[in-house]
Amino acid sequence: MNMLSIQADSWFDGDAIHHQPVTVVIDAATITAVHNGRIAVPGSDSLHVGFLSPGLVESHAHLFLDGHEFDTAKRQAYMEAGREAFLATGRKNLERLRASGITLVRDCGDKWGINHALRTEAAGTALPVVRSAGVAVRRKGRYGSFFAEEVVDATTAAACVRTRTDSDDVKIVMTGIIDFAAAAVKGGPQFSFDELSAMTAAAKELGKPTVAHCSGREGIDIAVRAGIGSIEHGFFLDAELLERMATGGTAWTPTWIPVAWVRDNPAACAVGADGVAGLGRILDQHRANLIEAHRRGTVILAGSDAGSLGVRHGDGLHDDLAAYADAGLPMASILASATSAPRRAWGLAGGRIAVGQPADLAAFAASPLTGLGQLRRAVATVVGGRLWQAQSASRLAAA
């Protein structure tokens, strides 16, 4: 790509929203200048947009799953479709993510290695960068069969973790699914504190962040004490746990939308009146915990569990962000949860618009302050210095 200058009417730098125009200059995949106002940059191609941000991040997705299929029987049959079908779905999902302004996606597990394969395919292209957790780890006979390998004790669990040399994160299935009517997690934690500590220590030896599928106070308490890097889902948190997470640096990916979709579409999951009532209580508590997490400084990573029933890739992240807004989180914090916070949590460069930062950007027609829905469709993205433009985007002009 030639040197590119992007002129934006307003912008988010990764921490704060700016209401004044800016010109961002990109050369050799790096931001080389940030100028106040709209200026012509000799020798560059130029693009004018309404709003510029670091590229959005989907912190929890399953790329091989088709979130656009709502029929549960068809979804079950799809699980037997095989590798080529899974790859084809994943490729479409990456394009959907890009169209939604997402330039980095963390795939949180599949047992067929589709996430690793897509990571390789997307590398060096204008598609979103794939961060892959590979195959997760679960207790034998417990929840997680479609994305996790079974282990039987602390020794085999730690040994399993040590094989994850090609994974970007190590995912551990700490608890099961939720009983909607009871508004509680089904069953106890899959691993004890000692077992989980052995696994997090093994991951630390590899230099890999850890991710735990975890809900319920008992499981989250163990996960936080054992040093898990981020809690995925995290239903039934409380103020004391959120404070410990804030103090210890444990992040939280709330994945609001899958549960909200079931509440709003109970017939699709054969959920009765008791279940709907339970879902309401669960989501009320989740909303309160979002507010409490923000107040205490717990790191929030925006992630939707895209691919789950009712959660479309791309749209899912924006639905989650809308839930944060409905809960009362400030716009700058909402944007940070989907830009700078994940990259910082994972030790990655980027997530900020500043000189010397990687050119990893998303451009939109207008500011989200005029409506968060403005972020649902990008007019352009830049990944590794490679520009992609939506069909409706302004044409490049020689400056």
Regions found by a protein language model. Give the residues of each.
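Histidine/acidic-residue-rich, glycine-tolerant segments that coordinate divalent metal ions
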Residues: 109-222, 230
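N-terminal metal-binding scaffold of metallo-dependent hydrolase/deaminase domains
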Residues: 1-40, 51-52, 366-371, 386-387
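Active-site gating loops and adjacent loop-to-helix segments of metal-dependent hydrolytic enzymes
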Residues: 62-88, 92-95, 134, 138-146, ...
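His/Asp/Glu-enriched, well-ordered alpha-helical/loop segment
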Residues: 205, 270, 284-367
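Short amphipathic alpha-helices and their capping/turn segments at secondary-structure boundaries
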Residues: 42-55, 115-124, 154-167, 237-251, ...
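Active-site core of metal-dependent hydrolases
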Residues: 180-288, 296, 301, 306-308, ...
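Metal-associated gating/positioning segment near the N- to mid-region
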Residues: 50-121, 226
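C-terminal cap of metal-dependent C-N hydrolases
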Residues: 9, 336-340, 355-399
